[in-house]
Amino acid sequence: AFLLGKICTQAGLPNGVLNIINGTGPSVGQAIVEHPNIKAISFTGGTKTGASIARTAAPMFKKLSLELGGKNPNIIFADCNYEKMLSITVKSSFANQGQICLCGSRIFVEKSIYSKFKNDFVSRVKELKVGDPFASSTQIGALVSKPHLDKVMSYIDLAKEEGGEVL
């Protein structure tokens, strides 16, 4: 968002046409949604938060754009450019620790290449450098919070309970 703002300014967009404001939802986000002079809200994130925004903004007839609860699949066919697909699939699964709405959270693979893909994907993921998020060599850093870590771990536990295998 910050870079988008810089690009728009460099392109000559007048000040005040696009405003990018960073902050936490309960303080900054709530103030933006409730402000009577803000006529449009765009939000990408969780469904629960989106519903809260809609409840507040809709009676004020604000324009709303809500992109909620993404479950983006990677769909992989046998005739793809295999190396390019593998690189993109690893990146799309683990960019920003998998915590952004654009990350692939599911992978559908054509049966004829499933075994090869599974082995190659796991091998590439194991090569990712886990470490300090401030180190330039780190490819996988920390999750955003302890509650988020607990949520991720609960999904892993659930997968195991349902017969899944951690690769």
Please describe what each predicted stretch is.
Residues 1-29:
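PLP-dependent aminotransferase-like
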Residues 2, 30, 34, 83-91:
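Amphipathic, non-transmembrane alpha-helical secondary structure
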Residues 6-10, 34, 55:
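Short, well-ordered alpha-helices that flank and scaffold nucleotide-derived cofactor binding pockets
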Residues 25-31, 45-52:
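Beta-loop-alpha module in the N-terminal Rossmann-like domain of NAD(P)-dependent dehydrogenases
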Residues 28-32, 141-144:
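Short, solvent-exposed polar/charged micro-motifs at secondary-structure junctions
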Residues 35-41:
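Glycine-enriched alpha-helix->loop->beta-strand junction motifs that scaffold or abut catalytic
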Residues 40, 46-167:
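ALDH superfamily catalytic-core signature
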